[in-house]
Regions:
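Bacterial carbohydrate/catabolite-sensing allosteric modules
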Residues: 1-6, 21-29, 40-185
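A glycine-rich helix N-cap at a beta->alpha junction
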Residues: 32-33
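A short, well-structured beta->alpha microelement
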Residues: 8-18
């Protein structure tokens, strides 16, 4: 059996359709990793590639195409467990986009383990999975006057933005805050 694997990058959904068309002419199947795409984008790609095997390794709402992904609920639950075991009594979340299925699962897992242990989400920032929204989250947290809080970030980009902003503000992590990201970046 002769298998070749190629990796292609499409930065924006507006050039994804063209790239998919080119790839489909020279490949036997596609494994798609595009966590920032919306359902409509997945539908377009799926329609263009009807006769090619196509699997997504990023969560996709609905039954648009076969998906192999992580257990986002369990990831959120484990993040909460880790912060509880670290001794935090106040908790916050830098949540992913509400339109993203996996972001909601991560938040639900985090919230459920907190409730099970007698805690709650005390601070919530709605992010967009970007580094800049992580930086903005720190500003929002500073305005809320919370400190010594365990924070779960729904992805590592936002966690890195939060950490970067914290260092710019001479904060200590751990110390002033603890943070757990998601994605294993």
């Amino acid at each position: 059996m002769n298998i070749q694997i190629s990796i292609h990058s499409a930065k924006h959904s507006n050039n994804l359709s063209e790239q998919v068309r080119r790839i489909s002419n020279s490949h036997d199947g596609i494994i798609l990793m595009a966590p920032t795409l919306e359902s409509e984008d997945y539908e377009k790609v799926s329609r263009k590639l009807k006769r090619y095997p196509l699997v997504s390794i990023a969560p996709v709402d609905g039954n648009i195409l076969p998906t192999i992904t992580f257990d986002s609920y369990e990831g959120g639950r484990l993040a909460g467990e880790s912060l509880i075991k670290s001794g935090f009594k106040k908790f916050g979340i830098i949540a992913g986009p509400i339109v993203k299925w996996e972001a909601n699962l991560r938040k639900n897992g985090f919230n459920d383990v907190l409730k099970k242990n007698g805690f709650q989400i005390d601070w919530n920032y709605q992010g967009d999975y970007s580094f800049l929204s992580g930086k903005a989250a720190l500003k929002g947290l500073q305005e809320s006057k919370f400190n010594n809080m365990g924070i779960f970030s729904s992805n590592d980009q936002m966690a890195l933005g939060f950490l970067h902003a914290a260092l710019e503000n001479n904060m200590r992590i751990p110390g002033d805050f603890g943070i757990v990201g998601y994605d294993n970046m």
